Amino acid sequence: MDKVYDKCCGIDLHKKLIVACFKQGNRQEIRDFGATTRELLEMADWLKEGGCEMVAMESTASYWKPLYNILETCGLKAMVVNAQHMKAVPGRKTDVKDAEWIADLLQHGLLTASYIPDKDQRELRELVRYRKSLVGERARELNRLQKMLEGANIKISGTIRDINGKSARNILEHLLSGRQIDSAEYDILYEKKVIAHNLKATKEQIIDDLNGVMSALQKKMMRILLNHLDELNAHIRELDDDIDNFMKPEEKEAAKVIQDIPGIGNTS
């Protein structure tokens, strides 16, 4: 069978061990490396010195990511392949090591590379994934806040739509100060716009809904929860800025176009 690569390397990845089989024509050399950055750089130097044209590795857990990043940074071409695809290729001998088998398949062009986005796209995806996890954590905290308020018989959700909004926060800060809301206090808060002017509920309904009973422990827990929400909101805003700065002009333009579709927003 014709050889696609004269000099190539197959890599068998483990958590703390990397087995590399470097093929050069009909000759091969197998070396073991650790998984530290220093050892990965040593392997990259070894492959560069040998004139390696392509490196192939299995998509094993997330072990491939640091190695792929280092090879990419060092200017070496690499591909990540699906383990099931390799198992489907016939002809493997029982005594052949995984790294040797990967190298042999690579040398003869029998491997199909999985799609790996470029470095900028990978980093953008990491930002988006992390933002999504923080948004999920914020939603869970808001649910905890809602249950905490219900336990104190404060029915803020029936008065204010957005429990994470400015109006809700102003009211909660007022209640945490230990003050109840009577008719006169309502008028003062309304004048100061602590209570928003666009609420649909009546004055009497708002007063009834917001006057609950909170113990000292409930107030302490709510304060911790609100502080955590502030941190999450700040981190999400920071990630929004990072994502915006990471996007290329054409990506931003495409994002604007797709937002014309109903239900699609900037964070979708």
Language model features by range: what are they?
Residues M1-S268:
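A detector of single, family-specific signature residues
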